[in-house]
């Protein structure tokens, strides 16, 4: 049985009152978390910035692709700000993340797919492997991702608490 939110390939994005959204609950949640529906969003600058050094070095666009990941999925630097092109790249990334999760026997859930988007599939695998060990999240999370901790979870909390907070926050 196909889970409706998992059908990212056939989902659509659209603009409503200046905010980009999707007809797919998972895609819509990712857009909401990553950019608030603003295709010009740059990490640390939610309304966007015209500074080219910042624009070219940070996560950007609806799905907050970093330059290297965007390039892997066919996006030129400025195309990260194009909602349709960014969405096509996101669909490919989701496809690859589903394959990576399956390969590592990690359940295909909205939370796991989002965290694979945020942390990379390898980063999620590291967190997943530490969930039941009581490892503090600061030791399990990728070092460049420390800003992605949930504010309600102390920095020395176990990885499981961090994961559960994200699971509740994703809510798909």
Placement of each model-derived feature along the sequence:
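Alpha-helical segment that forms one wall of the substrate-binding/catalytic cleft
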Residues: 62, 67-126
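Catalytic and substrate-binding regions of cell-wall glycan-acting enzymes that process beta-1,4-linked
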Residues: 111-171
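Short loop/turn and capping residues at structural boundaries
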Residues: 41-43, 81, 128
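N-terminal export signals and maturation junctions of secreted/periplasmic proteins
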Residues: 1-20, 24, 39, 50-52, ...
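Short, charged low-complexity linear motifs
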Residues: 50-51, 99-105, 143-150
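Short, functionally critical alpha-helical segments immediately adjacent to catalytic or ligand/cofactor-binding
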Residues: 21-51, 65, 90-92, 111-121
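Short, surface-exposed glycine/acidic/tryptophan-bearing loops
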Residues: 42-72, 133-137
